[in-house]
Design a protein with these regions (language model features):
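Pocket-forming structural segment of enzyme catalytic cores
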Residues: 1-76
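Acyltransferase
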Residues: 70-139
């Protein structure tokens, strides 16, 4: 779980968000910011100090690419962490996920409200309000 910063607060996708929010991230994949900004049609609109890029906007503001996992249920990271332990791996304890970063103290869900806002803002501002009634009129 990494802390994210909003860089484009005026974008309706972030309406209702706090200035800083948390989001689950996979520890097995990375997309470098340099690779994203090398494409003129893409813009980084949210990132964190530790995790890097979280959200990218493209194609005239109608497409969003999310590099974290706001869809994760509360126990997903816990399941993955304990699964890897049982396989004899030495996984990193997910940051900011357990109370006091201690798996024995229980979960601390910090991303649920942002995830709900993200999906409802996307549906409201970028699907319902921007999609023509006649789908043949989409540009």
């Amino acid at each position: 779980m990494q802390e994210e910063f909003i860089m484009k607060l005026q974008n309706p996708i972030f309406r209702g968000f706090d200035d800083v929010f948390y989001a689950p991230h996979s520890r097995h994949s990375t997309v470098l910011k340099e690779d994203i900004i090398s494409h003129d049609e893409l813009e980084v609109i949210s990132e964190g100090d530790e995790c890097g890029v979280y959200m990218v906007m493209g194609r005239n503001g109608r497409e969003f690419y999310i590099l974290g996992h706001p869809e994760y249920s509360p126990g997903t990271l816990d399941f993955e962490y304990h699964r890897d332990l049982s396989l004899g791996l030495n996984p990193h304890i997910p940051d900011n996920y357990y109370v006091d970063n201690d798996p024995g103290k229980g979960l601390l869900v910090r991303w649920r409200s942002h995830a709900n806002l993200l999906y409802s803002n996307w549906l409201n501002y970028f699907v319902y309000q921007e999609t023509p009634y006649d789908i043949r009129n989409i540009k």
